[in-house]
């Protein structure tokens, strides 16, 4: 059963420590003897804490701590919780008081310390069994010492603060920790060698400190060291220690000896405690052991303690050694003072040695102590004896001895009194002197002996009764033995003397004072004392004692002197004193003999004597009973007597036979006896013996031979075995080792067998695989078929058993040859393509020149007139046809792609994947790669990229380019050819797209954009990057301004318009214009394609490939879009379009996967060819422009572009009719083609189908390739429409939605270009372009430099309307990359908010289409210099504006507006960063288209550029500086939450001006009031635009910049200006304002309040798109969108409001007419830009209105279809259709869509751009995914990956 998860039991510290004691559940751990219950530890801990804190005990009064069930979790938890509460309360009460200090930081009580150590040990020693895993009988034997033993040791040892403790072999360190916790020692050190204990010691250290802190107890410093204490590094620690503990019980002699060497260096007074003594307890110094450690230490035993150690339960003694070198010093001092008295010194030593035997004599302690004194003072004693008479001397001498013993003092006094005054006086002096000396030597004497000897009894010779027992224990030496023998037989006398001595001794000890007894007592005491003094002297006198016993007492006394002199020279004092009293001498001798009696000594002597006597040797005594010698016979025969048996008489009846037998026996015995008696018997026996001996010899010889043979064999076999083992590398010395080695060999052999078998299996397997592969390969080879032949017409299935080597080589060679031939073909194709590319580049240059010229006049006309007429016509026809076809084919594909893209990061085209660590080199490589792409090196790849996504295929399918080509041919044959090249037949493009998808290397940014859009990383580098990019952008702006000046009208248009102009010429330009448009498209395509790459791949690999100056111009123009491109494939599509018709179309598919939905916009350039492209152009151009300007990050450049665009717009107005005609023709062709292609795409995008159908169809199929071509609109649409268009295949329905989005995007991007919604959305769907890498910065520098050189020329080159993008293309790849980097750096929350606002304005793109066209100019005029902070809102807005709408709208718009619209729409859809990227591309295309149709295209392009530029503003800066941003962002956040549920309602109020915290978009779209003001301002702008149009030539640069600002501050920005005037507009305005003026209105009062730059003409399409531009002027239609927009604003303000609002309409609504920031207004000064933009917008609006009406009709129809498809899926969830607003379901639907977006933020309807926007938010992605499912792939749910996600 699984144990339930329970928490550990934690005890909090009563000391207020942060440390806690935790116990894991269950508390019972271990098993068997090691089982332990931690619950008991918890209870004990609580008890100890209660003891420490009496106040704690009250908490446990009701609890019986002794009866707690430790196995009950609930009980223990309650106990612990109660304890913790009590502890917390006490700690809290004591906090700040002196109470803690009183009870804390003190040493623990021994019992508490023991508990702590037990806790520590239990916690640290996880597996006690491991401690016992050691080698037996090694120095690493582990044993633990108990706590009690250490405590006992401490009782015997006094410690101080200066002491240092060291534990040698500390184990786990518990002794060290106990010492550290017990006393304030100086330091404690533990050294342990074994690994396991040392490892546990580390844990003990940590846990001990923790627990001591928990209890609040002190402990001294300590260290636990792992190492060998015998190494030199630890010698210092040992020698400096004053207290050493060593458990040396199992160390062994070697380690003990090394320890002795170290202990010899210890300081005096050091204590060593060990479990085995280092010297004997009774150690005595002799001249033979002076080097022993015992000479410098006292040894004593610590009483054994039971259970003191872990290895045995028996008591174990420990020994205390005290280092004292004075012992040795005193020994030598004695030798020195004794001089030549060797005998005395020797006697002293002997006496010292015997002292241990006398320690048992209790009363003799002082006698023994004074032996040395007697010896030392022997000379004095001798003098005393000589000077005094015998009695006096004896008495004095005796008294001297007695005086040393308190018991004898009285007796000594009596003797002194009896001996007289003289003797007394001398005796006193002598006694005093002797006493002093004895006192001085007392310690010395005792120290030389063991502590046991300290209490000395009488020496072995004492005769005292108490000494008799001890005497028997004396050592038996030869002298003692001989003396004993000599005194034998006189035992009686000896006994008498012993008795006398006993009596006298007893009398003296008892203190009796009898007269006679006094003398005897004194004499006996004296003799005894003297004998004790020198045992040698006593022994020497024993021979004399024997004579004394034989003679009388006097005679014996006389004999004692010579015997003493002869036998003992060492005792002259005794001899002298014995002179008068020989009797005492004899007693002494008797005492000596008696004392020599030892137990069994006599028996031993007797046996010795008997054993040596001869007769004893001969005489054998009976054996002792029971011994082996005792014989059995002795026992048996003792009682046996022998009796003769009587011979019985012969029986009478003996049988005869028996008698015969007995006779035979008898005769035989008798004969044998006789034989034995004969003389021959002996020789016979001897002979037999000899024979047997000989036989035995033979047998022995044989045995020896066999033994030798065996030995030889063994030796030989052993030798051979060793040789063999050496050969095998086995070196062993024992059989066990050999067996072990053999086992290893066997094991290895088995392993090898297993390995071999496994390898055989693998080889068999691989052979089978090889055969299968060979079979498979050969089946396809005709050679194999020939070899194997056929059976019944079938190739043999079996591979030939083996191919001959020759055959195999031939086959391989043939394969190689085939491969080489194929490679040659490919190389040939590449060379052909390169040639075509060079031709295209030349043609592009020519076109750029022509485009510059045409842009001034033709583009405007073409964009306007062609846009409306051709877009309308073509939209209906082509879109319808293509929508059916494309939707069916592409919807499924897009659905899959949308799903995949939404979940995946955009795949960076391999073209962009450059491995280089050096940023400079990487930048160069990127530029080179981009150039190669521009040059068409990746053209082949471009076509395949169409396969990458259905969207791209649609673009590839753009067969209309041929139509465009003819038109272009009119302008210039080369251009026409290029256009055709740019747009190969749909099928070819589809194939190319397939190829592109297959060629990740060439994957255009469009592809990567969708993925990258998913991960906008805009956060941290903004400020830094802002400054860097600002500088670079300023340079770019200057260059661009110069370039623009060189080609004023084309450049501005081209800077943003290249993309648009591409689209615009394609869609709206007349045949005459279509040539320039085609040129411009080519330029824009290359630019946008590059931009697309830039957008997609931060690497911006595509950017470098700008084909030529025209492309460069486009690139310069497009770079801003490329910057935005990262947000969408739109820019990429444009750039690709610019590169070349075919290759761009081919390449575009690669990149377009991201923008597949936006594919329709690519037709922007194709717009001239295709109505869809035309329709998208204005919005796309506006979007692209805004993007371009944004990407350029040079508002000046945008202003110039805007001015140029205004001029171009005028020209386009003139050429609009011609362009429109051509575009209509082209559109019709394209629509037919697209409808055919779009038919596949249409399945997915019915709304798009119609207008965008061709474009979309082309886009889906050729979108990737077209990304270079048509990406302006296509990219824009790809973002907004590649999803939305695909979704809304009916161009009008989708265009309406797309246009609302595109419009919003345009108004955001074009009109409101100031905000680059795509940028803001970058954080949701687009890669984080704010994350600028060193490589990107280096690339930007390179591109900047190139821009400086190329910018002027390209812009000058593309003055033609068709080249409207050419001047822009004057921007080099550097421009594109710089724009991208700038965008990256400029992304800010404000930009996101602006993007959101733009997206909301995108919702109004229907109305805004024409309005956007004008507005693009206005915005360019107004917002050229708009700060990038607005970029944030730009992307989100574009996203919400729903790329699909811009696509549809762009398509609807016609050539000029179509491209711009597509770009704008893309921008709207780019509301997410991804969408922004697409929008950028769209903007680029829009710019190109704007070149074609300068007014609409320029405004759109400028807007897109601006829109992108605002994105470029760092969010952080915006956020910090723009108050509106904060308000809006807050509102966005708030409305996000609310918006989810009632996003539409919330959005309405926000757009309506509800002041709830204005979140980024909410502030931007704050109120309808703002929208009204936008309307008012728009009207003003329209008036200004009219004035500007009249004076468009005058203010091109200035106006363009203001317009750019305006478009940068698009819907949201303009709306903000209104808001500034109104409630929340200031916030929006601030958002719209460039980062330089976060709070433009406040910061830059000079700038007039931003005015909605929607031009009055907008009203037509603004009304159509006005609801989309709800932020702008057309609020009524957008209210839903507005409502939606605010919701998006909160939810996707950062991401993309409009996009999120799912109301491009709402976005467009939010995209109010571009409000001119004070700076912009001031810059604009005059309203001519507005007027121009207004005029252009009016013209475009008219065209767009017409187209939009048609498109709306188609789109509405398609939307209805989509509503069926998507509406059911998205619309019900997100009102996807409403996003398009009037285009799809009407404003209400748009509002619903917006609401859904706000709610889920994923409702992109089916609009690709919208999807992109959706990418910003997870909810959006989810809803998008949901929508995709419901919408048959139309859903753009995943904004980030929406473009790719859109089924194609």
UniProtKB/Swiss-Prot annotation:
Residues 391-405, 429-439, 453-474, 1221-1235, 1289-1300, 1532-1545, 1585-1598, 1681-1696 have a biased composition (Low complexity). Disruption phenotype: Lethality is observed starting from first instar larval stage and animals do not survive beyond the third instar larval stage. Severe decrease in total H3K79 methylation levels and developmental delay in third-instar larvae. RNAi-mediated knockdown causes a severe decrease in H3K79 methylation levels and lethality. RNAi-mediated knockdown in neurons causes lethality while knockdown in glial cells does not cause any observable phenotype. RNAi-mediated knockdown in the developing eye causes a rough eye phenotype, which indicates a change in photoreceptor neuron composition in the eye. It catalyses: L-lysyl(79)-[histone H3] + 3 S-adenosyl-L-methionine = N(6),N(6),N(6)-trimethyl-L-lysyl(79)-[histone H3] + 3 S-adenosyl-L-homocysteine + 3 H(+). Broadly expressed in most tissues. Expressed in a large subset of neurons and in a small subset of glial cells. PROSITE patterns: DOT1. Residues 19-336 form the DOT1 domain. GO terms for biological process: DNA damage checkpoint signaling; DNA repair; heterochromatin formation; methylation; subtelomeric heterochromatin formation; transcription initiation-coupled chromatin remodeling. InterPro entries: DOT1_dom, DOT1L/grappa, H3-K79_meTrfase, SAM-dependent_MTases_sf. The gene is gpp. Residues 364-373, 526-535, 582-593, 1236-1263 have a biased composition (Basic residues). It is found in: Nucleus. Residues 507-518 have a biased composition (Gly residues). Its main location: nucleus. The lineage of its organism: Eukaryota, Metazoa, Ecdysozoa, Arthropoda, Hexapoda. Gene3D superfamilies: 1.10.260.60, Vaccinia Virus protein VP39. Residues 338-537, 558-593, 886-908, 960-996, 1033-1075, 1165-1190, 1221-1333, 1345-1374, 1432-1463, 1486-1508, 1529-1559, 1573-1604, 1637-1713, 1731-1757 are annotated as: Disordered. Histone methyltransferase. Methylates 'Lys-79' of histone H3. Required for Polycomb Group (PcG) and trithorax Group (trxG) maintenance of expression. Also involved in telomeric silencing but do not in centric heterochromatin. Probably participates in pairing sensitivity. In contrast to other lysine histone methyltransferases, it does not contain a SET domain, suggesting the existence of another mechanism for methylation of lysine residues of histones. Was named 'grappa' because the eyes of mutant flies are of a color similar to that of the Italian spirit. GO terms for cellular component: chromosome, telomeric region; histone methyltransferase complex; nucleus. Residues 419-428, 1697-1706 have a biased composition (Polar residues). The modification Phosphoserine is found at residues 491-492, 494, 1318, 1324-1325. Belongs to the class I-like SAM-binding methyltransferase superfamily. DOT1 family. GO terms for molecular function: histone H3K79 dimethyltransferase activity; histone H3K79 methyltransferase activity; histone H3K79 monomethyltransferase activity; histone H3K79 trimethyltransferase activity. Its EC number is 2.1.1.360. S-adenosyl-L-methionine binds at residues 142-145, 165-174, 192, 228-229. Residues 339-360, 1574-1583 have a biased composition (Basic and acidic residues). This is Histone-lysine N-methyltransferase, H3 lysine-79 specific. Keywords: Chromatin regulator, Methyltransferase, Nucleus, Phosphoprotein, S-adenosyl-L-methionine, Transferase. It comes from Drosophila melanogaster (Fruit fly).
């Amino acid at each position: 059963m699984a144990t339930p998860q329970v928490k550990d039991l934690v005890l909090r510290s009563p000391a207020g420590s942060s440390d806690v004691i935790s116990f894991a559940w269950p508390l019972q751990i271990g098993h068997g003897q090691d089982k332990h219950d931690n619950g008991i530890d918890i209870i004990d801990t609580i008890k100890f804490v209660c003891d420490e804190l009496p106040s704690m005990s009250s908490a446990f009064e009701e609890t019986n701590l002794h009866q707690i069930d430790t196995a009950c979790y609930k009980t223990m938890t309650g106990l612990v919780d109660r304890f913790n509460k009590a502890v917390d309360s006490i700690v809290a009460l004591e906090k700040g008081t002196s109470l803690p200090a009183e009870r804390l930081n003190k040493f623990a009580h021994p019992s508490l310390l023991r508990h702590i150590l037990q806790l520590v040990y239990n916690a640290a020693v996880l597996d006690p069994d491991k401690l016992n895993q050691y080698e037996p009988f090694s120095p690493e034997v582990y044993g633990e010492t108990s706590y009690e033993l250490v405590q006992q040791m401490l009782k015997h040892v006094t410690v101080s603060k200066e002491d240092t403790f060291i534990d040698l072999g500390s184990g786990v360190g518990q002794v060290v920790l106990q010492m550290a916790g017990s006393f304030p020692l100086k330091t404690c050190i533990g050294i342990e060698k074994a690994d396991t204990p040392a490892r546990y010691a580390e844990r003990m250290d940590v846990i001990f400190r923790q627990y001591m802190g928990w209890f609040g107890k002190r402990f001294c410093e300590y260290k636990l060291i792992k190492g060998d204490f015998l190494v030199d590094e630890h010698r210092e620690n040992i020698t400096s220690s004053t207290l050493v503990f060593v458990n040396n019980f199992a160390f062994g002699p070697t380690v003990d000896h090394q320890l002795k060497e170290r202990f010899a260096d210890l300081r005096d007074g050091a204590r060593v405690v060990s479990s085995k003594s280092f010297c004997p307890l009774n150690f005595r110094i002799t001249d033979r052991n002076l080097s022993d450690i015992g000479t410098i230490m006292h040894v004593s035993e610590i009483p054994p303690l039971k259970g003191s150690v872990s290895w045995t339960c028996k008591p174990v003694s420990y020994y205390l050694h005290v280092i004292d070198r004075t012992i040795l010093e005193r020994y030598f001092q004695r030798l020195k003072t004794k001089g030549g008295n060797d005998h005395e010194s020797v006697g002293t030593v002997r006496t010292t040695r015997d002292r241990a035997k006398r320690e048992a004599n209790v009363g003799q302690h002082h006698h023994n102590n004074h032996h040395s004194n007697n010896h030392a003072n022997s000379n004095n004693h001798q003098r005393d004896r000589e000077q005094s008479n015998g009695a006096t001397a004896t008495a004095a001498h005796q008294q001297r001895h007695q005086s040393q013993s308190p018991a004898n003092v009285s007796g000594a006094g009596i003797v002194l009194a009896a001996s007289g005054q003289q003797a007394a006086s001398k005796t006193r002096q002598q006694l005093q002197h002797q006493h002093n000396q004895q006192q001085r030597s007392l310690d010395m004497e005792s120290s030389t002996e063991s502590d046991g000897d300290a209490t000395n009894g009488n020496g072995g010779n004492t005769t005292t009764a108490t000494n008799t027992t001890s005497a028997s224990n004396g050592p038996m030496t030869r002298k003692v033995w001989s003396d004993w023998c000599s005194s034998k037989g006189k035992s009686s006398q000896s006994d008498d003397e012993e008795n006398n001595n006993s009596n006298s001794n007893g009398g003296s000890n008892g203190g009796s004072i009898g007269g006679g007894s006094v003398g005897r007592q004194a004499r006996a005491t004296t003799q005894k004392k003297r004998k004790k003094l020198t045992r040698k002297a006593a022994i020497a006198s024993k021979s004399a004692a024997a004579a004394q016993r034989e003679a009388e007492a006097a005679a014996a006394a006389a004999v004692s002197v010579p015997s003493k002199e002869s036998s003992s020279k060492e005792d002259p004092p005794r001899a002298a004193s014995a002179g008068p009293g020989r009797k005492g001498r004899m007693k002494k001798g008797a005492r000596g003999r008696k004392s020599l009696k030892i137990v069994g000594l006599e028996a031993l002597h007797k046996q010795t004597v008997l054993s040596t006597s001869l007769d004893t040797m001969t005489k054998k005594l009976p054996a002792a009973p029971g011994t082996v010698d005792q014989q059995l016979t002795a026992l048996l025969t003792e009682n046996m007597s022998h009796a003769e048996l009587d011979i019985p008489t012969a029986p009478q009846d003996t049988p005869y036979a028996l008698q015969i037998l007995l006779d035979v026996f008898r005769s035989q015995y008798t004969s044998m006896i006789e034989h034995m008696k004969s003389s021959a018997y002996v020789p016979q026996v001897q002979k037999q013996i000899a024979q047997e001996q000989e036989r035995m010899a033979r047998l022995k010889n044989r045995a020896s031979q066999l033994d030798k043979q065996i030995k030889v064999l063994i030796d030989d076999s052993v030798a051979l075995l060793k040789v063999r083992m050496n050969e095998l590398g086995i070196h062993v010395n024992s059989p066990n080792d050999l067996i072990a080695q053999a086992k290893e060999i066997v094991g290895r052999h088995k392993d090898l067998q297993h390995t071999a078998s496994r390898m055989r299996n693998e080889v068999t397997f691989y052979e089978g695989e090889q055969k299968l592969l060979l079979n498979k390969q050969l089946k396809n080879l005709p050679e194999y078929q020939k070899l194997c032949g056929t059976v019944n017409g079938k190739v043999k299935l079996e591979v030939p058993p083996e191919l001959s080597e020759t055959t195999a080589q031939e086959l391989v060679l043939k394969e190689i040859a085939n491969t080489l031939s194929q490679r040659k073909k490919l190389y040939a194709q590449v060379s052909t393509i390169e040639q075509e590319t060079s031709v295209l580049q030349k043609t592009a240059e020519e076109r750029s020149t022509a485009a510059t010229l045409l842009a001034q006049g033709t583009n405007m006309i073409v964009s306007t007139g062609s846009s409306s007429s051709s877009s309308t016509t073509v939209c209906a026809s082509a879109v319808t046809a293509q929508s059916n076809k494309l939707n069916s084919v592409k919807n499924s594909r897009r659905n899959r792609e949308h799903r995949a893209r939404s979940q995946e990061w955009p795949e960076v085209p391999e073209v962009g994947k450059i491995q280089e660590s050096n940023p400079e080199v990487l930048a160069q490589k990127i530029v080179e790669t981009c150039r190669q792409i521009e040059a068409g090196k990746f053209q082949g790849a471009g076509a395949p990229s169409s396969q990458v996504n259905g969207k791209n295929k649609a673009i590839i399918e753009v067969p209309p380019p041929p139509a465009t080509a003819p038109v272009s041919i009119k302008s210039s044959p080369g251009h026409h050819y290029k256009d055709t090249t740019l747009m190969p037949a749909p099928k070819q493009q589809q194939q190319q797209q397939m190829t592109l998808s297959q060629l990740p290397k060439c994957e255009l940014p469009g592809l990567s954009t969708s993925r990258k859009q998913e991960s906008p990383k805009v956060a941290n580098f903004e400020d830094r990057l802002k400054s860097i990019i600002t500088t670079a952008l300023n340079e770019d702006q200057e260059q661009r301004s110069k370039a623009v000046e060189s080609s004023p009208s084309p450049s501005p248009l081209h800077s943003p318009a290249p993309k648009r102009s591409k689209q615009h010429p394609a869609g709206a330009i007349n045949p005459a214009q279509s040539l320039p448009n085609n040129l411009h498209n080519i330029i824009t395509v290359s630019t946008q394609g590059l931009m697309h790459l830039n957008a997609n791949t931060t690497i911006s690999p595509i950017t470098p490939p700008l084909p030529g100056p025209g492309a460069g111009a486009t690139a310069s123009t497009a770079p801003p879009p490329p910057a935005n491109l990262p947000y969408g494939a739109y820019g990429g599509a444009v750039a690709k379009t610019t590169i070349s018709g075919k290759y761009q179309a081919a390449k575009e598919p690669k990149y377009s996967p991201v923008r597949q939905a936006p594919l329709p916009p690519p037709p922007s350039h194709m717009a001239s060819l295709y109505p869809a492209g035309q329709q998208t152009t204005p919005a796309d151009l506006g979007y692209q422009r805004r993007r371009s300007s944004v990407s350029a990050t040079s508002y000046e450049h945008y202003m110039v572009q805007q001015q140029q665009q205004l001029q171009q717009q005028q020209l386009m107005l003139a050429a609009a009719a011609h362009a429109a005609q051509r575009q209509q023709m082209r559109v019709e062709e394209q629509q037919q083609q697209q409808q055919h292609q779009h038919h596949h795409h249409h399945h997915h995008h019915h709304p798009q189908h119609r207008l965008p159908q061709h474009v979309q169809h082309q886009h889906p199929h050729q979108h990737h390739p077209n990304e270079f071509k048509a990406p302006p609109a296509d990219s824009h649409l790809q973002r907004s429409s590649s999803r939305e268009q695909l979704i809304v295949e009916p161009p009008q329905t989708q265009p309406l939605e797309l246009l609302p989005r595109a419009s919003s995007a345009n108004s955001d991007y074009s009109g409101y270009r100031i905000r680059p919604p795509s940028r803001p959305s970058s954080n949701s769907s687009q890669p984080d372009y704010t994350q600028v890498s060193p490589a990107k910065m280096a690339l930007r520098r390179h591109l900047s430099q190139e821009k400086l050189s190329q910018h002027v020329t390209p812009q000058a080159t593309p003055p033609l309307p068709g080249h409207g993008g050419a001047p822009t293309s004057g921007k080099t790849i550097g421009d594109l990359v710089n724009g991208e980097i700038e965008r990256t750096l400029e992304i800010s929350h404000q930009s996101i908010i602006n993007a959101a606002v733009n997206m909301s304005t995108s919702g109004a793109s229907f109305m805004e289409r024409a309005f956007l066209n004008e507005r693009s100019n206005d915005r360019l005029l107004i917002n050229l210099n708009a700060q990038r902070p607005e970029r944030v809102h730009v992307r989100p807005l574009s996203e919400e504006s729903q790329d699909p709408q811009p696509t549809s709208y762009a398509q609807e718009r016609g050539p000029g507006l179509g491209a711009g619209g597509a770009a704008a729409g893309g921008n709207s859809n780019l509301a997410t960063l991804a969408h922004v990227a697409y929008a950028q591309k769209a903007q680029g295309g829009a710019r190109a288209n704007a070149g074609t149709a300068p007014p609409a295209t320029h405004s759109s392009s400028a807007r897109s550029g601006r829109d992108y530029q605002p994105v470029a503003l760092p969010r952080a800066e915006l956020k910090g500086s723009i108050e509106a941003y904060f308000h809006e962002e807050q509102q966005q956040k708030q409305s996000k939450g609310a918006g989810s549920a009632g996003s539409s309602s919330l959005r309405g109020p926000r757009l309506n001006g509800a002041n709830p915290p204005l979140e980024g978009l909410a502030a931007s779209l704050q109120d309808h009031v703002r929208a009204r003001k936008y309307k008012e301002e728009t009207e003003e702008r329209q008036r200004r635009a009219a004035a500007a149009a009249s004076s468009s030539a005058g203010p091109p640069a200035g106006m363009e910049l203001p317009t750019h600002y305006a478009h940068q501050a698009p819907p949201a920005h303009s709306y903000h200006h209104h808001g500034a005037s109104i409630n929340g507009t200031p916030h929006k305005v601030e958002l719209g304002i460039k980062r330089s003026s976060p709070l433009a209105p406040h910061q830059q009062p000079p700038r007039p309040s931003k005015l909605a730059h929607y031009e009055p003409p907008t009203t037509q399409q603004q009304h159509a798109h006005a609801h989309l531009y709800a932020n702008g002027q057309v609020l009524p239609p957008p209210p839903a969108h507005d409502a939606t927009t605010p919701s998006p604003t909160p939810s996707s303000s950062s991401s993309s409001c409009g996009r999120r609002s799912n109301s491009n309409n709402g976005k467009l609504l939010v995209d109010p007419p571009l409000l001119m920031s004070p700076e912009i207004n001031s810059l604009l000064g005059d309203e001519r830009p507005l007027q121009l933009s207004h005029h252009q917008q009016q013209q475009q609006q008219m065209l767009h209105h017409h187209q939009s009406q048609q498109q709306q009709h188609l789109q509405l129809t398609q939307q209805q279809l989509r509503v069926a498809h998507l509406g059911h899926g998205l619309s019900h969830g997100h009102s996807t259709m409403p996003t398009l607003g009037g285009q799809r379901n009407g404003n209400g639907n748009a509002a619903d869509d917006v609401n859904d977006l706000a709610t889920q933020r994923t409702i992109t309807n089916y609009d690709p751009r919208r999807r992109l926007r959706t990418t910003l938010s997870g909810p959006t992605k989810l809803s998008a995914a949901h929508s995709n499912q419901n919408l048959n792939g139309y859903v753009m749910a995943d904004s980030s990956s929406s473009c790719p996600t859109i089924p194609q």
